[in-house]
Amino acid sequence: LELPVFEGDLVEKGDLLVGINPDIYISATSRAEASLNTSKSSLSSARARKAQADAQFIAAELAYNRSTQLFDQGAGSRADYDQAVSSFELSKAEITAEEESINAAVFQIKSAQASRNEAADNLKRTTILAPQSGIVTALTKEVGESVQGTGMMQGETIMKVSD
């Protein structure tokens, strides 16, 4: 805990009034940022796999059309035709799977962004800055004392800054 002011001190708006050790919050922010970058990389990979699946679909569709034409004319074997149908259907399924991978990666990015934002918000909460210029008129806590408060209700008064 850092408490660089004393009762009677003159402070300017934005001066540090209270600070807690930010190390774990910095680490959490770094982890969240790394997770976001990993998610973005996963999206890029999914898009690349989708492009590859699209190319394979075009090739499979051409082979299917050729094989169908040859088979219908009696010039192609049933095995070749069946293989072309199978490859064509498989390539369609691959496209669908890669589209879902892209969707999943997009949702993962949104989740990672939310985690990063939460970590950044928590890091910002490691400091309390003077809301206005003035004099510290009441300092009710000392270094080492605990302060109660939650996200749902207001915590204890640590100090007052009067103008």
Question: Can you say where each PLM-predicted feature lies in the sequence?
Answer:
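Long, amphipathic coiled-coil "stalk"/hairpin helices in large membrane-associated assemblies
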Residues: 1-42, 73-80, 139-142
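A structural signal for short beta-strand/turn segments enriched in small hydrophobics and glycine
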Residues: 8-17, 67, 112, 119, ...
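Extracytoplasmic/periplasmic beta-strand context in beta-sandwich domains
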Residues: 15, 27, 55, 79, ...
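A short, hydrophobic secondary-structure junction motif
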Residues: 14, 91, 159-163
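Alpha-helical hairpins and coiled-coil heptad-repeat segments
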Residues: 37-99, 123
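Soluble periplasmic/extracytoplasmic beta-strand elements of cell-envelope proteins
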Residues: 4, 18-19, 56, 63, ...
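Elongated periplasmic alpha-helical coiled-coil
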Residues: 44-45, 99-146, 163
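Sec/SRP-type N-terminal targeting helices
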Residues: 25-33, 50, 54-57, 79-81, ...
